[in-house]
C-alpha cells in the first residue's frame, strides 16, 4: 500500500507539472501573437471597394501588430468561396475574413443552402466601416433622375440592364430590392466580380450598376451618371446626389457594414489582440483621410458590437428578401 501511495503521489506530481508546462506554453504562445504574417481573406476580386477598404485596414493593422497583414482575394460564388476557406481554417488568428453586409446579410438571405454557418462558424473581431451604394448609369441613359428612370423602365420592361458582381452579390440584392420597391423590371446581368461589371457599364454594353466612392472620378469625368445613394443620408463623397428616400423611393436605405472575423474557436486573447490592433488602426489620420475619400464612415468597437451588427443585418436582409419575394439560388 505504501509503494502504491508513493506511485500515485509521483504520478500526480508529474501530471501537475505537465499541466503547468502546458498552460505556460499556451500562455506564452498567446502573449507572442502574432509571430508570423496574418492572412486577411477578402471574398471578392481585386478592385472593389471591399478590397480597397481591406487593404487600408490591413496596412495599418500591420503597423499595430508588428507583423504583415496580407490581403488574399478569394472571390467567387457570391462570397461563399472565401467564407468557406476561413470557416475551415485553423482557429489560431492567422487566417481572418473581411466581412460585410453581403457575407452576413444578402448572401445568406438569397441562398437555399450553405456549407457553413455564417454566425456559428465565425468569431467577430471588430466593426470597421459602413458606406452607402450609389445607383450609377451609363450617360446614354436619358433619364435625369430616379423618377424619370422608373417611368422609362415601366414603359420599356427589360430594356434597362443592371450589372451585378454575381448571383447573390450585394449588387444583385439591391437591384432586386429596387425592382420590387418600384415595380420596374430592370434585367440583371451577372459577372464574376464588380470590376468586369463596371467595365461593361462604362463601355455602354450594360445600362446601370450600383457603385461606391471609387466611382467618383468616373462621375466627375462624365463617364457615369449618378442618380441616388442607398443610404440613410447623403454620401459626403457625392454631396449633390440625393438619397433614394429623397428621390421618392420611400424606405429604400441599405447601408453596407464592414468588419473582420476569425474562425470560430479562436482564443479570446488572440481576438482581443486583433480587436485592439483594428481599433488602433482606425484612429490613424492617414486611414481616416483615405476612408473619407472613399465615402467610408468609420465604426470601430468591440467584438460584441460586430456581432450585433451581423445579427441585425441577417435579420434585416432576410426580412427584405421575404417581403420583396427575392428568389433564393
Residue locations for each model-derived region?
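N-terminal (or domain-start) structured segment
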Residues: 29-120, 159-161, 167, 182-210, ...
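C-terminal lobe and pocket-closing loops
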Residues: 215-283, 312-315
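N-terminal signal peptide c-region/cleavage motif recognized by signal peptidases
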Residues: 24-26
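An extracytoplasmic/periplasmic, membrane-proximal ligand-sensing/linker region
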Residues: 35-37, 181-184, 268-329
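Hinge/capping helix and adjacent helix->loop/strand transition within the periplasmic-binding protein
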Residues: 61, 88-94, 109-196, 208, ...
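Short coil/turn segments
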Residues: 45-47, 101-102, 130, 138-143, ...
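Bacterial N-terminal signal peptides that target proteins for export
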Residues: 2-16
Amino acid at each position: 500500500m505504501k509503494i502504491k501511495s508513493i506511485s500515485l503521489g509521483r504520478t500526480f506530481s508529474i501530471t501537475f507539472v505537465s499541466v503547468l508546462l502546458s498552460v505556460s506554453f499556451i500562455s506564452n504562445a498567446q502573449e507572442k501573437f502574432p509571430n508570423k504574417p496574418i492572412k486577411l481573406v477578402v471574398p471578392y476580386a481585386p478592385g472593389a471597394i471591399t478590397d480597397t477598404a481591406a487593404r487600408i485596414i490591413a496596412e495599418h493593422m500591420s503597423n499595430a501588430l508588428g507583423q504583415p497583414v496580407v490581403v488574399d482575394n478569394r472571390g467567387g460564388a457570391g462570397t461563399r468561396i472565401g467564407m468557406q476557406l476561413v470557416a475551415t481554417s485553423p482557429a489560431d488568428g492567422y487566417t481572418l475574413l473581411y466581412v460585410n453586409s453581403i457575407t452576413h446579410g444578402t448572401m445568406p438571405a438569397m441562398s437555399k443552402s450553405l456549407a457553413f454557418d455564417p454566425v456559428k462558424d465565425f468569431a467577430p473581431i471588430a466593426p470597421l466601416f459602413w458606406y452607402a451604394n450609389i445607383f450609377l448609369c451609363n450617360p446614354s441613359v436619358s433619364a435625369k433622375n430616379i423618377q424619370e428612370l422608373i417611368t422609362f423602365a415601366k414603359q420599356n420592361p427589360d430594356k434597362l440592364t443592371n450589372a451585378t458582381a454575381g448571383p447573390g452579390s450585394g449588387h444583385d440584392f439591391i437591384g432586386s430590392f429596387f425592382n420590387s420597391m418600384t415595380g420596374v423590371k430592370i434585367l440583371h446581368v451577372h459577372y464574376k466580380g464588380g470590376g468586369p461589371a463596371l467595365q461593361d457599364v462604362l463601355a455602354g454594353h450594360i445600362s446601370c450598376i450600383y457603385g461606391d466612392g471609387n466611382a467618383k472620378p468616373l462621375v466627375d469625368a462624365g463617364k457615369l451618371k449618378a442618380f441616388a445613394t442607398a443610404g440613410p443620408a447623403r454620401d459626403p463623397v457625392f454631396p449633390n446626389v440625393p438619397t433614394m428616400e429623397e428621390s421618392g423611393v420611400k424606405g429604400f436605405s441599405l447601408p453596407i457594414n464592414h468588419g473582420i472575423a476569425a474562425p470560430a474557436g479562436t482564443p479570446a486573447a488572440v481576438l482581443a489582440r486583433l480587436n485592439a490592433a483594428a481599433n488602433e488602426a482606425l484612429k490613424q489620420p492617414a486611414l481616416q483621410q483615405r476612408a473619407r475619400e472613399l465615402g467610408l464612415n468609420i465604426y470601430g468597437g468591440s467584438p460584441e458590437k460586430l456581432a450585433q451588427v451581423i445579427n441585425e443585418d441577417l435579420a434585416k436582409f432576410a426580412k427584405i428578401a421575404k417581403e420583396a419575394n427575392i428568389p433564393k439560388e
